[in-house]
From Swiss-Prot:
This is Protein Teyrha-meyrha. The lineage of its organism: Eukaryota, Metazoa, Ecdysozoa, Arthropoda, Hexapoda. Residues 195-214, 523-533, 570-580, 667-686 have a biased composition (Low complexity). The gene is tey. Disruption phenotype: In embryos, M12 position is closer to the ventral nerve cord and situated ventral to muscle 13 (M13) and external to muscle 6/7. The longitudinal orientation of M12 is also oblique probably due to an alteration in the muscle attachment sites. Also displays a reduced number of synaptic sites on M12. No effect on muscle fiber size. RNAi-mediated knockdown results in the fusion of the costal vein with the L1 vein in the developing wing, producing an adult wing that has a continuous wing margin with no separation between the end of the costal and L1 veins. Residues 235-263 have a biased composition (Basic residues). Keywords: Nucleus. Residues 140-152, 471-482, 630-640, 687-704 have a biased composition (Polar residues). GO terms for cellular component: nucleus. In embryos, expressed specifically in M12 (at protein level). The keyword Transport does not apply. Required for the correct synaptic targeting of motoneurons RP5 and V to muscle 12 (M12). May be involved in the negative regulation of Tl in M12. Involved in the correct patterning of veins in the proximal (costal) region of the wing blade. Signal peptide: none annotated. It is found in: Nucleus. The keyword Transferase does not apply.
Length: 717
């Protein structure tokens, strides 16, 4: 096809092309119809303000007025002054639609329509020359103008526009789209027949298949109404021929002698009136169009503008201006002052601006709110489906991220992390449960337990061991020299051979007067050699040793096996050897240990020399003060020493709760020892007696301090 005269850049959309091309000589017609009277147009009228004029692009305000009574009401057309020009005089019943391209020529097009509204859903009527609509058939279009369109094609009209640019119909291949009138402008240059141009132009003006049908009809009414009223202002009839070119100079001779009969678009075939129709007295380029064609365009455009509040006032102002022949001083839409030369250019600019306001972002919303109807079910389903899909996507993404995080944690920390996450990370009870279930102690707990073993306080050891089975003997005030037997110091209900995860500490004190220096028991010293010294006694032996180490424990390396332990203090005082007879003169202070509930092979903790402190310097100071206070006349006699409490010097034992070979009923040689003790207990000047009493006091203090291993004190006189 030839290129458009206006160009696609100036008129970017096909709907505006339809508006501009339908009145193809409007520019010259506006110049030829001067002057206009200025007395009728009330520019300060409220309906001429900008908001009312911009309502032309609002589909909801326009759509419900486009009913058949607006299109078919010939009384309104008579009031507009176009009914007389609707039909030519005496030409017959043939309509101007009956052209060479139309298959059948019926008297009227719109008389065959039976729908209550031209735009009522779900049917959409599009007039096409190839779809045989002039026989009464209806076309169900699904392009972007259809309000019942539900496909993606409705939102994308570019494919139709591309086909129109080539001059082809988007629905038919062998004909041109009636919406595209650019070929009509060029066809007039090549002297095509008037019937072809007139029928295509009129069908396109009456067609509603543009991308925005209400806007195209409403905005084109301004241009067409001016031309129609200018054409209807003369009572004379001027015949013309078909053989003139489309654009004309102002001086064009009209020497034609045939008449045309035109049926009005809104009138039935029986309501045609034969009148004389003449253009203005001077020649103008609109004279080549048929009079009935202009009347039809005028009736449609007037009906469209009357449907809009601003458009109605604009129509009335233009009608008054056309009747008086004066140009307005300012634009009724924007209020801009215009000269006579700028009026028609500004008019087309306003049409272009109104269409651009309505073409873009409101296109989808116009379909949803068309004629105040609810959106199509397919559109509602699409919105609901998209919302549901978004929620599903969010849920799936969250679940997937959680699974990935879980895998990363398992790969990084292993199953131990997953087991530990089941319990509280700060609660020690939960940590203990975790350790019991997994069978291993967490590394941080293992380090803490090792520190506690190395730096444990001896005084608070009894509080930490509630089930140790050792009840400390507290000497009574009445009998300070008597000590309970070791069999009563132990809990007989305790289970032997079971540590229960609790650590025990033992300290054994053995005071010996041994003439044989090679016989020394494995002992743990209570009083260090540097801290205290007794009068007339030799330096004490102090050491920590293990007699038998059988094997290491399975849980920790701090557990060892020990048979017995005691503290040996050799007293070499000469006075004690002279007042005592033989081996029976030895003063022995022994404290047995209640180490666990096992035999002599039981696990016992052995720590460094610095950490195991059973007494302090305060205790030593007290012992020395009591020794000074006790003189020769105030010494106590140790009475009621039972043979059960006696122990041989060479055989220190570890008390146990089990009846067996380690039972503490050693009765050998107890009679001699008892007699020796009784004979020597009356000696008030004996320093060994002072030593025994002082050791008794120190052991009672140790028992009150909470040392769990002190159970028995044996004294030999």
């Amino acid at each position: 096809m030839e290129s458009n005269a206006f160009g696609s850049s100036h008129l970017p959309s096909q709907a505006l092309v339809v508006l501009s091309e339908a009145a193809s000589g409007l520019h010259e017609a506006l110049r030829g119809q001067r002057p206009f009277p200025s007395r009728v147009i009330p520019f300060d009228f409220p309906l001429l303000q900008l908001p009312d004029a911009k309502d032309l692009h609002n589909m909801s305000l326009v759509g419900n007025y486009f009913n058949p009574h607006l299109l078919l009401n010939h009384g309104m057309l008579v009031a507009n002054g176009a009914a007389a020009a609707a039909a030519a005089a005496g030409a017959g019943p043939a309509s101007y639609f009956a052209s060479d391209r139309s298959p059948l020529g019926k008297p009227s097009v719109l008389s065959n329509f039976s729908l209550p509204s031209a735009f009522s859903p779900p049917k959409y009527i599009g007039i096409s020359l190839d779809q045989n609509l002039f026989n009464g058939s209806e076309s169900f279009r699904t392009d972007s103008a259809s309000p019942t369109c539900t496909s993606h094609e409705s939102m994308e009209g570019s494919q139709d526009y591309d086909a129109v640019e080539k001059g082809e119909s988007p629905r038919s291949n062998n004909s041109q789209d009636p919406r595209d009138l650019r070929h009509l402008h060029n066809a007039g240059k090549s002297h095509q027949a008037l019937a072809t141009s007139s029928s295509a132009s009129s069908s396109s003006s009456s067609s509603c298949s543009t991308s925005n049908p209400a806007i195209s009809t409403a905005t084109s009414s301004v241009a067409v109404s001016m031309a129609s009223h200018l054409a209807a202002s003369s009572p004379h009839h001027h015949p013309h021929t078909h053989a003139h070119s489309h654009p004309h100079p102002l001086a064009h001779p009209h020497a034609h002698s045939h008449h045309h009969v035109g049926h009005h678009v809104g009138a039935p075939p029986v309501s045609t009136a034969v009148t004389t129709h003449h253009h203005m007295a001077h020649p103008h380029p609109l004279s080549h169009h048929h009079a009935a064609h202009h009347a039809a365009l005028a009736s449609l455009s007037m009906a469209g503008l009357r449907a809009v509040p601003g458009g109605l006032s604009l129509v009335s102002g233009l009608q008054a201006a056309a009747a008086g022949g004066a140009i307005p001083e300012m634009c009724p839409v924007c209020g801009l002052k215009l000269s006579a030369e700028e009026w028609h250019t500004h008019f087309l600019t306003e049409l272009d601006r109104l269409y651009k306001l309505s073409a873009g972002f409101e296109r989808a919303s116009l379909q949803a709110t068309y004629m105040f109807a609810p959106p199509c079910p397919a559109q509602e389903n699409a919105i609901r489906t998209s919302h549901n899909r978004w929620e599903t996507f969010q849920r799936i993404r969250n679940n997937r991220q959680n699974r990935l995080r879980l895998k990363v944690r398992k790969r990084k920390y292993g199953e131990m992390y997953m087991m530990e996450s089941l319990y509280c990370s700060s609660c020690p009870i939960c940590k203990r449960k975790y350790a019991l279930e997994t069978g291993k102690i967490p590394p941080e707990d293992d380090a803490k337990s090792q520190e506690e073993i190395e730096t444990v306080d001896v005084e608070s050891c009894n509080d930490e061991v509630p089930d140790s089975g050792s009840e400390l003997a507290t000497p009574s005030s009445g009998s300070s020299g008597t000590v309970m037997p070791p069999s009563s110091m132990h809990n007989s209900n305790s289970q032997p051979g079971k540590l229960d995860g609790i650590l025990y500490r033992t300290g054994c004190v053995l005071s010996q007067k041994d003439p044989h220096p090679d016989e020394h028991d494995v002992s743990t010293n209570v009083t260090t050699a540097s801290s205290s010294s007794w009068p007339g006694e030799a330096p004490t032996q102090a050491h920590i040793s293990v007699k038998t180490v059988s094997e290491l424990s399975s849980t920790t390396h701090h557990y060892y096996n020990a048979d017995s332990c005691g503290v040996g203090v050799n007293d070499t005082n000469s006075s004690s050897s002279t007042h005592n007879n033989g081996g029976g003169s030895n003063k022995d202070l022994m404290m047995d240990t209640a180490s666990c509930q096992n035999d002599s092979d039981e696990d016992v903790i052995v720590d460094d020399d610095d950490t195991v402190k059973l007494t302090s310097k305060i205790n030593y100071g007290k012992i020395q003060r009591r020794q000074d206070e006790q003189n020769v006349g105030s010494s106590r006699s140790l009475e009621n020493i039972s043979p059960v409490e006696e122990r041989p010097r060479s055989e220190p034992q570890v008390s146990s709760t089990e009846p067996g070979p380690m039972d503490i009923s050693h009765n050998n040689n107890n009679n001699n020892n008892n007699n020796n003790n009784n004979s020597n207990s009356n000696n008030n000047n004996n320093p060994s007696t002072k030593y025994a009493e002082s050791m008794e006091n120190s052991l009672s203090q140790l028992s009150s301090m909470g040392v769990p291993g002190l159970t028995q004190l044996d004294t030999k006189a």
